[in-house]
Amino acid sequence: MRAILTGQVGMDKKPYVEAVKDFAGQQGEALDAYHVGDIMYAEAKDVRTGKILDLPLSRLNSLRRAAFKDVIAGSRDQKNVIVNTHATFRWRHGLFSAFDFDQIRALRPDLLVCLVDNIEVVHHRLHEEHDIDATLKDCMVWREEEILATELLSQAILGSSNGFYIVSRGRHQDTRRTLFRLVCRPDMKKVYPSFPMSHVVDLPDTLAEIDHFRAQLSEHFITFDPGDVDEKLLLDRAVAKAKEGKVDEWLDVTPHSFGGSKSRSKPIRVRVREVLDIAGDIDGQIYMRDFKLIDQSDMIVSLIPELPGGVPGLSSGVERELQHAFEHTKEVYVVWKPKKNPSPFITETATRIFRSVDEALSYFESQGMFGEKNLFGH
């Protein structure tokens, strides 16, 4: 498959794509990667690293067209390709596009993928690599623009949104296997894992159960995991600080198992007031993004754990996800762990209900849902 990968500045896409390429090589698959930004810098030897977006738009467009021309020529006979580029830029020139329709058509992409990550991480990377004054709000707006522009591009080039995907970069563990499978294993089933988040952050046993569920699904399917972007936890911490009257203080953002990278040596510092300024954006984009992740999946598999006191861990978010999947004709599978029986709103919309993750996996395997794998299990 031929894929175009987009994402705002600050996503650190190049090492991610190289990791996908290396992973493909380990599976015996040829996967070629093109980094449009690197090709542009190679052409513009007078431009210092990190400064290319400060060029006049006319020269920037000329450099980009020259770079894409090289990519089109170089990738013509290659089977599996990832082109690392952007759909939009929000820079000192304002908002502007980063592609030309004629060249995207000439690339003949099969899918367009927009890569996303937690906004405080994107903001941190952006300011580490570039001399620019961008707020968390700026980064939130840019991410939404990048997603929309990529989706519109897929509709224009592919004729529908069926080849458009939102993929999180992954912070606890990167999602190189997900992108590899999208490009090199396109026939694998695509799954949206659904589980409670906000209500269980202080329940380590339940978190471990959820992590096991997520890991098992990702072993056998292409998964689009909503827990890989966990900005709601950041907002909850900011709100708690604000209630203490500490809106001008800083938050040290530490990793969490839902999406935090345990490899970062120092926590990222963000101002409480700046997080509160994007409260509506965080909630709105979670709502939009999670539904899009369901739309791009073949089926939803939801884990309903039993919380202390025998209470079903069925959050309002999980209920809405199940209903959205049902109304959009997705296969709906529920792993129901509580002793209390599920309500008709679950039983009447679920394709099948299981009592354990192992039972669900056995059923999926018996139905031939597990994709074919190579000798390495991928």
Would you name each region that the model predicts?
Residues 59-106, 293, 313-314:
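Glycine-rich phosphate-binding loop used to anchor ATP phosphates in small-molecule kinases
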